[in-house]
Amino acid sequence: MAAFTQIVEQASDILWNYLLLFLLVGTGIFFTIKLHFVQLSSFADGVRHLFKGFSLHGKAADKDGMSSFQALATAIAAQVGTGNITGCATALVSGGPGALFWTWVSAFFGMATIYAEAVLAQTYRTTVDGQVTGGPAYYIRAAFKGKFGKFLATFFSVALILALGFMGNMVQSNSIGDAFHNAFGVNRVVVGVVIAVLAAFIFLGGVKRIAAVTEKLVPIMALFYIIGCAIILVMNASAIPNAFVQIFTLAFQPQAIAGGVAGVTVQQAMRYGVARGLFSNEAGLGSTPHAHALAKVKQPQDQGALAIIGVFVDTFVILTLTALVLITSGLIPEGMTGTALTQAAFSLMFGSFGKVFIAICMLFFAFSTILGWYFFGQVNFNALFGSKYTKVYSLIVVLFILIGSSLKVDLVWALADFFNGLMAVPNLLALLALSGVVAGIARNKKD
């Protein structure tokens, strides 16, 4: 099993390091130019729609879709996951503080990509069995006609179901189990049972219940984490200026790396920073369009603007706060990584409550991701097999959640990363093929 895991990891590394990093960033740069820096010109519109969504408290989701804020909340639920805690720590250890600069760069261009995804998801959404639905599988068929388009759409759907619906949710459950076992000594199986039961209850309520939960959960979890990070940064304010010096200097001058992180090259800072940004905000991977497709908006451009805000919240706010807490802690050279490093950084200021705080955040982040990824998988499962088998899909996901809470999931992580990469390829090809459609819609925006 260890040998097979290594093979999958090597294949995943080749896919991500030699194809997807360039394809994802290149697509972002392409849309940034083609759409005339839409991430800047539409940012204010996105903020306006965000606050409008807060004030309206959108209507309950139904067969005709969900409110634009519910769609954004569902997308952010998937975007803001355990990677914002553990993945950020790993990127800083592997790529140094300069990696955060390259995370910002990839996220900036990713905003243009996710705008295109949301616009196309809105444009090519359809109604199946009386329920509004949409996502990459539908605009892939529009981009490539005939058997080739059908093959790419099916390939995307299968890869997404495996990467997110099954294995991805298994990993999220495992993260919750580990966090609660380490913080409270709770048996991982017990944690798995509780998470599986809660998830099953929400799954059975369909898109209406998922949207209702994410609409409330996402603002609460984001605010809770932001306040915790802000308290630490205020207490450690004197170290913040030097943290920014390290971020900008070490992105270009590896020989100037301070704090003992020796041997990290500019290439490593770029690689780990860009990869972390792409993994975190999911721009270009083809996941979040499933939520944006269901938004009830006047025009596709409105949801595109909101999608930009999703990347901003995920990367420029939550992930950046995590990085600043870690850099100012001075613990990066100590040899720790992942959750252990983040828990240690928070424990410096919060004491024993640091582990508890991270465990609670892991619960929020991972469980919200489970809901988002389940929904994305359901859309594609229904596209392949029909909505009458939705409960079968729900049962399989619940079983994976239950099993994942207590197992060692190295192979599952490797497979999830690999299939995540595979699903991005047809999505990016479709985005580029339909770039003219996106540009035309963007030009015809009405105030």
Regions found by a protein language model. Give the residues of each.
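Selective recognition of specific alpha-helical transmembrane segments in multi-pass small-molecule
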Residues: 109-117, 193-207, 218-238, 271, ...
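Transmembrane helix-loop junctions in multi-pass membrane proteins
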Residues: 3-4, 34-39, 83-88, 165-176, ...
